[in-house]
Amino acid sequence: MVLNRYALITNCNHKTLGLYYLWFSFLFGTYGFLLSVILRTELYSSSLRIIAQENVNLYNMIFTIHGIIMIFFNIMPGLFGGFGNYYLPILCGSSELAYPRINSISLLLQPIAFILVILSTAAEFGGGTGWTLYPPLSTSLMSLSPVAVDVIIIGLLVSGIASIMSSLNFVTTVLHLRAKGLSLGVLSVSTWSIIITSIMLLLTLPVLTGGVLMLLSDLHFNTLFFDPTFAGDPILYQHLFWFFGHPEVYILILPAFGVISHVISTNYCRSLFGNQSMILAMGCIAVLGSVVWVHHMYTTGLEVDTRAFFTSTTILISIPTGTKVFNWLCTYMSSNFGITHSSSLLCLLFICTFTFGGTTGVILGNGAIDIALHDTYYVIAHFHFVLSIGAIIALFTCVSFFQESFFGKTLRENTLIVLWSILFFIGVILTFLPMHFLGFNVMPRRIPDYPDALNGWNMICSIGSTMTLFGLLIFK
């Protein structure tokens, strides 16, 4: 595909914009990944290694930016923006998205939002609040630079506007521009994954927007929404944030489900086992995932019956998720092809890691167990197995499988991608599997130092991180 020098700001073609989303995703993701390598270098052994004692807030700033970038600027643009823009019109028989120019604007807002978030590092103390921006830390004028929190909030707002525009575009395209005679009931699992993701974004992003705007007004306009000294409530912010924050996890992983379903179905030359149940399972995941946000807040002093409700609802999500894994495996086992392409291997790796991450999620969903494991490395291990391994493998599966469609030629040979897959998989398993043991040893997250007794597991984690870096260099 030949592009002129102004194509980025003038092109409205959905395929071109989808490719730009992918390029932005890999560019931003590489930056975020290198930040995580800095964190693992610091945690290679106990005591401070590369961060000075008087500048320990730098560690907070790094993991804050790492989290925001990987969630909002790596996985979302790659799977939802890239795969959705490129293939949604094709899969529903449309020649173009409903609003091509709005689609172009939503792409251009992504690098603007990224630059705003990165600018927070230029402030004197940075915005070391964690990606959750919890008050009263984020509204404190003593330990942080208010301007750093400002630009992070504005960056998230700009990114949210871009996501809402894309979501409206996708839903309108499917409802009004699909091919004649193509009913909603016969749309593919991949198409439904993008539709359900778009609906979740439209329902939850306004709540996040309201929450961070209240935070901004607390910082600069003398409101007291989250200040307990004047009858404000910091827990209110947690409710507002996690009402978006937990569905966001499914917003990230549902397009990955669509990619994996499409690749498995195509590679094994058969329709998915239980095709309609796969769509129903995604709908159930979306509904249940939107009403379980309080499981992030078990330690905030909830009543017992509240904990019981959210524990049971959280564990209930494992039923539709298990349905999807079962159907994928049935489709694979009913085929005689075996692993014929690197994307088939990546799909199996996704299923393994996602299943393991989901199992640890069921453990953490239990209110009694979570009180012991809350804010330990067990939590980090859980969500990185689902996101850092699961969603990222789905992103690479997408590029590996569709590379001829995307670029008109095979950029990487099958053998090289298989080699990268194995090296990457071993690296991430070495990085995140020992974190479960660190969590059981109650190593707190977001702290750059730890007892000497935990040196061994942390050393293995850091070696795995380095191995993942080498694997990424092979794929480049």
Swiss-Prot record:
Q: Which reaction does it catalyse?
A: 4 Fe(II)-[cytochrome c] + O2 + 8 H(+)(in) = 4 Fe(III)-[cytochrome c] + 2 H2O + 4 H(+)(out)
Positions contributing to Ca(2+) binding: 42, 448
Q: Which lineage?
A: Eukaryota, Sar, Alveolata, Apicomplexa, Aconoidasida
Which residues are involved in binding Cu cation?
246, 295-296
Protein residues bound to O2: 250
Q: Which GO terms describe its cellular component?
A: mitochondrial inner membrane
Q: What is this protein called?
A: Cytochrome c oxidase subunit 1
Instruction: State its Enzyme Commission number(s).
Output: 7.1.1.9
Function noted in UniProt: Component of the cytochrome c oxidase, the last enzyme in the mitochondrial electron transport chain which drives oxidative phosphorylation. The respiratory chain contains 3 multisubunit complexes succinate dehydrogenase (complex II, CII), ubiquinol-cytochrome c oxidoreductase (cytochrome b-c1 complex, complex III, CIII) and cytochrome c oxidase (complex IV, CIV), that cooperate to transfer electrons derived from NADH and succinate to molecular oxygen, creating an electrochemical gradient over the inner membrane that drives transmembrane transport and the ATP synthase.
Q: Which residues bind heme a3?
A: 382
What membrane topology does the annotation report for this chain? Multi-pass membrane protein
- The enzyme class is translocase
Which pathway features in its UniProt record?
A: Energy metabolism; oxidative phosphorylation
Describe its assembly.
Component of the cytochrome c oxidase (complex IV, CIV), a multisubunit enzyme composed of a catalytic core of 3 subunits and several supernumerary subunits. The complex exists as a monomer or a dimer and forms supercomplexes (SCs) in the inner mitochondrial membrane with ubiquinol-cytochrome c oxidoreductase (cytochrome b-c1 complex, complex III, CIII).
Q: Where is this cross-link: 1'-histidyl-3'-tyrosine (His-Tyr)?
A: 246-250
Keywords, ordered alphabetically: Calcium, Copper, Electron transport, Heme, Iron, Magnesium, Membrane, Metal-binding, Mitochondrion, Mitochondrion inner membrane, Respiratory chain, Translocase, Transmembrane, Transmembrane helix, Transport
